[in-house]
A protein has these predicted regions:
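Glycine-rich, acidic loop segments that terminate in or are immediately followed by a histidine
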Residues: 1-97
Length: 97
């Protein structure tokens, strides 16, 4: 999926007022597209989409960042996308500590 499709998914998620944290990743050719969104409630609890996605992106050869509510990133190592996405739960737990 390209970044526009991922952004559409995030917009739909936001429109439905689903709380929490959303992180999506997709391989496009030899690149990785990543996007994250954080609900208002989660932002108030200290979560930040840009900080999260920066950490996730580094795990698949990329970088990125963004606002507290939404962030985008790219990566250069599609084989590591699964590992990068697995890190999300670790990051969330670390923020709770």
């Amino acid at each position: 999926k390209d970044m526009n499709q991922l952004r559409q998914f995030v917009d739909n998620w936001k429109d439905k007022k689903i709380g929490g944290i959303l992180v999506l990743g997709a391989v496009q050719g030899d690149k990785v597209n990543l996007i994250s969104a954080v609900s208002e409630e989660a932002i108030k609890a200290g979560y930040h989409a840009g900080k999260l996605l920066k950490e996730v992106a580094t795990r698949c050869g990329g970088n990125g960042g963004g606002r507290p509510d939404m962030a985008q990133a790219g990566g250069k190592n599609p084989a590591e996308l699964g590992t990068a996405l697995d890190y999300v739960s670790t990051w969330v737990k670390e923020q709770q500590a």
